[in-house]
Structure formats: C-alpha cells, structure tokens
Amino acid sequence: VDKPDYRPRPWPRPNM
C-alpha cells in the first residue's frame, strides 16, 4: 500500500 503524498504544512507562527 502506498501512503498518501501529503505536504508538510508550515507551522502556524504566533504573531507577536
């Protein structure tokens, strides 16, 4: 079974 090609979404940076 081939795993789905998911993209590593950028981590939400806190706006300080």
Curated annotation (Swiss-Prot):
Cite a single GO BP annotation: innate immune response
Q: Where is the signal peptide?
A: none
What is the protein named? Metalnikowin-3
Highest taxon of the lineage: Eukaryota
Q: Which GO terms describe its cellular component?
A: extracellular region
Q: What keywords were assigned to this record?
A: Antibiotic, Antimicrobial, Immunity, Innate immunity
Induction record: By bacterial infection.
Known role: Antibacterial peptide active against Gram-negative bacteria.
